[in-house]
Amino acid sequence: MALTCTDIPKFICAVLLPPIGVFLEKGCDYHLAICILLTILGYIPGIIYACYVILAY
């Protein structure tokens, strides 16, 4: 999917605090719960998953 202007702030949020970027993209969904869990288990997996969600949707 093509990147839009709104994806840039989402990526910035995804790097600083990954669940925020996912919340801005998908809202309160199971993706948010997965991202929170991955961020707690390891910061880098949370960032990777957040970037995946932003790029995929």
Curated annotation (Swiss-Prot):
A GO CC annotation recorded here is:
membrane
Question: PROSITE patterns this protein is in?
Answer: UPF0057 (PS01309)
Principal location: membrane
**Which keywords are on file for this protein?**
Membrane, Transmembrane, Transmembrane helix
Which superkingdom heads the taxonomic lineage of this protein's source? Answer: Eukaryota
Q: How does it sit in the membrane?
A: Multi-pass membrane protein
Family, according to the entry, reads as follows: Belongs to the UPF0057 (PMP3) family.
Q: Which PANTHER family does the entry link to?
A: HYDROPHOBIC PROTEIN RCI2 LOW TEMPERATURE AND SALT RESPONSIVE PROTEIN LTI6 -RELATED, UPF0057 MEMBRANE PROTEIN T23F2.3-RELATED
What is the recorded name of this protein?
A: UPF0057 membrane protein T23F2.3
Q: Which organism is it from?
A: Caenorhabditis elegans
